[in-house]
């Protein structure tokens, strides 16, 4: 009679041998997988660090920009104020003058007015004196209409000058306008 059944001891040894071979074959694959995993984890850590650096740099740029805007608002009038200081000096000198010479006072006031006008012009503040111009409701405020020889809707007199800054009206000129005939 033939024994078709294998020896359990032999079978176990064969199984153990094939398991060892499988384990030996799996060992390089596992090492390669572990190396790939370690490499991927290192890359993830590097990318996370780069992201955090970029995020911090972006925040620093935003903060610096806010500081620059804040300083610009805070000191925007500095140049204009520097141009006004000579006017202030002239007015203080006039107040302290005790000579009583009215001609001298008038000359001082005229000089101070020129200084102020120059300071305003340096600050891009320009006077509107529209006598003879067509009435413009964006730059002029009509106080009254008067009979005149000029064309209708033309500025006849300026009661108070208007002012613009960089083409924007600060104050409209108060004017009288020629009425239609």
From Swiss-Prot:
Disulfide bonds: none annotated. Residues 21-39 have a biased composition (Low complexity). It comes from the Bacteria. GO terms for biological process: protein folding. One of its GO terms (molecular function) is adenyl-nucleotide exchange factor activity. GO terms for cellular component: cytosol. PROSITE patterns: GRPE. InterPro entries: GrpE (IPR000740), GrpE_coiled_coil (IPR013805), GrpE_head (IPR009012). Belongs to the GrpE family. HAMAP family: GrpE. This is Protein GrpE. It comes from Burkholderia lata (strain ATCC 17760 / DSM 23089 / LMG 22485 / NCIMB 9086 / R18194 / 383).
